[in-house]
A protein has these predicted regions:
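Bacterial N-terminal signal peptides
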Residues: 10-20
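Structured C-terminal helix/loop/strand segments within mature extracytoplasmic catalytic/sensor domains
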Residues: 22-47, 51, 224, 228-347
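Active-site-adjacent loops and short helices of periplasmic peptidoglycan-processing enzymes
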Residues: 27-191
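Bacterial N-terminal signal peptides that target proteins for export
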Residues: 1-11
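Active-site-proximal helix/loop microenvironment
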Residues: 81, 175-252
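A short small-residue
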Residues: 70, 125-127, 221-224, 312-313
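Alpha-helix boundary/capping residues
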Residues: 14, 144, 169, 246, ...
Length: 347
């Protein structure tokens, strides 16, 4: 027979284990607790880790089910180049200034030739002299990732103000400092020094045909990793927090949050998260720096459960199609875990 003290200790240990299991909700970088469906959530984490471990480069994943508070965080505090994902921060500060009365969504900005940016979106292909509203520019910035619209808005708001607002929200690693034109000048100037001070309309007409794809990609990679310039910086966890505020109606205000989400639902770049999803509502924003970086972030509603998902990549070695597919598979695994439908070509 066991000693009574040993039996009491065993019972106490069992009670503490039961309490710990019931209270723990998250699976973070070093926290392997769970909610009620521990084994299932751990299984999803292992599937995501498998994609990440076989990814030829760096990958960070942050996922949170806002209905259950279940959370998975893989390398989620590491700062990455966001590329156009930072446009969500610009959108947030834009709505912050709108609601403070500094500007109106109906205000107009007249485009000039100098505002043109390397092909992204649609404005570069249209004649200067248009006068889109600020809401029009916001929409173009999000759904077509238009860099001309982005610089027009960021110049209007002030990039320091965008960063300051992110910091005020508690997102200390989220920042924007340089314009798209700064970035393009640095990249193109690596290929041809005359473009280091080029005007916008000159960058649009850069003679890429004079250079091999390898030369262009080498210059692009140099600009990302060695030139001391960035389009945007953040972590997957911080962008996840920004999206969570948006989903709960607490980013600036309920009206502002809903407006940004409604625009994100009209996203035109759908080669990542939506790739394998079927009949699923999604609001998302991509960030493009192929073949080295392809990011996607957003909110996916699965059976009325809003799920925040953020995937950042970096230093990818391989083709763009494979890069996009790895990001798409992350979203597919998350959606399948929560009972959502996938397309028949997902394996």
């Amino acid at each position: 027979m066991d000693h009574p003290q040993r039996i009491a200790s065993a019972i106490l240990g069992l009670v503490l284990l039961t309490i710990g299991t019931a209270c723990s909700q998250n699976i973070g970088d070093s926290d392997l607790g769970s909610k009620t469906d521990t084994a299932s959530l751990h299984s999803l984490r292992r599937e995501l880790e498998q994609i990440r471990n076989h990814f030829p480069g760096d990958m960070s994943i942050y996922m949170k089910n806002l209905s259950t508070a279940e959370e998975i965080a893989l390398d989620s505090d590491k700062v990455y180049e966001t590329f156009s994902v930072i446009k969500l921060a610009i959108a947030a500060e834009l709505m912050h200034q709108v609601e403070s009365g500094k500007l109106s969504l109906s205000d107009r900005i007249t485009t000039k030739a100098a505002d043109e940016r390397l092909p992204s979106g649609v404005l570069y292909a249209l004649e200067p002299g248009l006068s889109p509203t600020i809401k029009d520019l916001l929409t173009l910035m999000i759904i077509t990732s238009d860099n001309e619209a982005t610089d027009l808005l960021a110049d209007k708001l002030g990039r320091a103000q965008v960063t300051a607002y992110m910091h005020a929200l508690g997102l200390a690693n989220t920042s924007i400092q340089f314009s798209d034109l700064d970035w393009d000048r640095t990249w193109l100037g690596t290929l041809d020094a005359r473009y280091r001070n080029a005007r916008g309309e000159q960058t649009v007409n850069f003679p890429f045909s004079k250079y091999s794809q390898a030369q262009v990609e080498q210059a692009f990679g140099h600009t990302i990793y060695d030139a001391g310039i960035f389009f945007g910086h953040s972590t997957t966890k911080e962008i996840g927090r920004l999206l969570e505020m948006m989903a709960s109606g607490k980013l600036v205000s309920k009206v502002a949050s809903e407006l940004i989400l409604n625009i994100m639902e009209k996203q035109q770049v759908n080669d990542r998260f939506p790739r394998y999803l079927k009949d699923v509502r999604i609001a998302h924003k991509t960030g493009d720096g192929q073949p080295f970086i392809a990011n996607d972030v957003g909110i996916i509603w699965v059976k009325d459960q809003p799920i925040v998902l953020v995937v950042f990549t970096g230093h990818h070695r391989g083709g763009t199609a494979a890069l996009h597919d790895d990001v798409a598979r992350v979203a597919a695994l998350v959606v399948r875990h929560y009972g959502g439908k996938l397309s028949s070509d997902f394996e």
